[in-house]
């Protein structure tokens, strides 16, 4: 039994890190493998993660890590029974993938403006709370080519767009994701999408 692609890990920088890897052949990850992780510190307990299958030869493990700070560094050991398959380390602050934004809502009754709001997925005392910026994807439900991305480069979790910039009488969907530039993070997953009907009426031209 051998590792084909070494584990790569990302952290939500609050309580959870996720590691994925590929084995050299079909593997029952939960029955055959264990990922042992330990904070590099004077006194810290050893933790063990039971991986799940991610495809026939892929494994994924969810590592619970409390009260993460920038200096945290973990040792990682991948075991198959008594055989050590791989040894590495992981620093959560250098591999951040934020949690997805929540509670995306579209308000259509604000004059001729669409107001989109969502929730920052972090509590105010978390390091990422004031570091997130966002991207909003809006698309026509009946025409996949009618899709656009709005970059929200300010911290407020809102976006205002003129209803007239979208087609009238069409159902649209929106979703939002987050990233933390100062942590050199990857993008979060997209939030669940929300749907609305763009009932904006074109003004009549006067002749």
Regions found by a protein language model. Name each.
Residues 150-159, 177, 185-195:
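Accessory, usually C-terminal, subdomains that scaffold auxiliary metal cofactors
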Residues 19-24, 33-38, 72-81, 116-123, ...:
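Structural signature of extracellular immunoglobulin-like
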Residues 43, 84, 143-144:
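Short coil/turn linkers that define WD40 beta-propeller blade boundaries
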């Amino acid at each position: 039994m051998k590792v084909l692609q070494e584990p790569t890990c990302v952290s939500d920088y609050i309580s959870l890190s996720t590691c994925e890897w590929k084995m050299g052949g079909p593997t029952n990850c939960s029955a055959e493998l264990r990922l042992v992780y330990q904070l590099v510190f004077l006194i810290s307990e050893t933790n063990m993660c039971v991986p799940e299958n991610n495809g026939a030869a892929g494994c994924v493990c969810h590592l619970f890590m409390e009260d993460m700070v920038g200096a945290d560094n973990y040792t990682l050991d991948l075991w198959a029974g008594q055989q050590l398959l791989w040894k590495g380390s992981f620093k959560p602050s250098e591999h951040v993938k934020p949690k997805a934004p929540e509670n995306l809502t579209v308000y259509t009754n604000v004059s001729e403006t669409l107001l989109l709001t969502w929730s920052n997925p972090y509590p105010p005392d978390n390091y990422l709370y004031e570091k997130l910026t966002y991207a909003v994807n809006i698309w026509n439900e009946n025409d996949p080519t009618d899709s656009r991305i709005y970059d929200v480069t300010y911290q407020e979790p809102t976006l205002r767009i003129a209803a007239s910039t979208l087609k009238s009488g069409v159902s649209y969907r929106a979703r939002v994701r987050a990233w933390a530039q100062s942590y050199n993070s990857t993008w979060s997953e997209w939030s669940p999408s929300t749907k609305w009907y763009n009932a904006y009426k074109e003004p009549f031209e006067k002749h």
